[in-house]
Amino acid sequence: MYDISGWKHVFKLDPNKELSDEHLEMICESGTDAVIVGGSDGVTIDNVLHMLVSIRRYAVPCVLEVSDVEAITPGFDFYYIPSVLNSRKVEWVTGVHHEALKEFGDIMDWDEIFMEGYCVLNPEAKVAQLTDAKCDVTEDDVIAYARLADKLLRLPIFYLEYSGTYGDVELVKNVKAELKQAKLYYGGGISNAEQAKEMAQHADTVVVGNIIYDDIKAALKTVKAVKGE
């Protein structure tokens, strides 16, 4: 079994986006610590299964970030369950999770499941609109969400999600200083190795996503920038 606490760099692949076999091989053989499969819309059991089968040809750890209960399938190493802490809708905080546990609770392998406390900070992002996230927040608000995830809920992951735009480095630094046991994931707007390296100075894990589909070479360079290998 893999130890997620040591992951510094992960790629996130959207099953609803096209990725060539050649580029998928580059991603999986890049030296990244893991590949997360997940997206905000258009995620189906069919495209998740296709992605799973494709990634399983390689040795890289594979995680399903669950956004739709209907798209859950066995075969992944881990399952990340996001709870959007700054959502205005309870369904995205605990509601969907409650329904999933009613249906699948008896057969879930709890050693494979990790809850993520999300704080979504880009109002233009699909995930913000889908979950009705309250993005007009102060730094004090974000710090409070971090404390909620880390100290009250004892979640293993606190995820700062800027999805599509590069985030506030100083805020990421200050959030990291607040966390005692939760790992800080950062995702959003990383388009080059320099940005990835900058965020890696503060976040425990840097998530690289959209740039995979825009500039595969730039995406691959983020691995070494983050891991320093």
Curated annotation (Swiss-Prot):
Catalysed conversion reaction: sn-glycerol 1-phosphate + all-trans-heptaprenyl diphosphate = 3-heptaprenyl-sn-glycero-1-phosphate + diphosphate
Enzyme Commission (EC) number: 2.5.1.n9
Binding, Mg(2+): 14, 40
Names of the cofactor(s): Mg(2+)
Keyword Transit peptide: no
GO biological process, one term: glycerophospholipid biosynthetic process
InterPro entries recorded: GGGP/HepGP_synthase_I, GGGP/HepGP_synthase_sf, GGGP_HepGP_synthase
UniProt entry tagged with the keyword Metal-binding: yes
Binding site for sn-glycerol 1-phosphate: 12, 159-164, 189, 209-210
Keyword terms: Lipid biosynthesis, Lipid metabolism, Magnesium, Metal-binding, Phospholipid biosynthesis, Phospholipid metabolism, Transferase
Domain of life: Bacteria
Any one Gene Ontology molecular-function term assigned to this protein's record: heptaprenylglyceryl phosphate synthase activity
Pathway assignment: Membrane lipid metabolism; glycerophospholipid metabolism
NCBIfam families membership: GGGP-family (TIGR01768), PRK04169.1-1 (NF003197), PRK04169.1-3 (NF003199)
Assembly and oligomerization: Homodimer.
Family: Belongs to the GGGP/HepGP synthase family. Group I subfamily.
HAMAP family, per database record: GGGP_HepGP_synthase
Function description: Prenyltransferase that catalyzes in vivo the transfer of the heptaprenyl moiety of heptaprenyl pyrophosphate (HepPP; 35 carbon atoms) to the C3 hydroxyl of sn-glycerol-1-phosphate (G1P), producing heptaprenylglyceryl phosphate (HepGP). This reaction is an ether-bond-formation step in the biosynthesis of archaea-type G1P-based membrane lipids found in Bacillales. To a much lesser extent, is also able to use geranylgeranyl diphosphate (GGPP; C20) as the prenyl donor.
Protein name: Heptaprenylglyceryl phosphate synthase
The organism of origin for this protein: Bacillus anthracis
Taxonomic placement: Bacteria, Bacillati, Bacillota, Bacilli, Bacillales
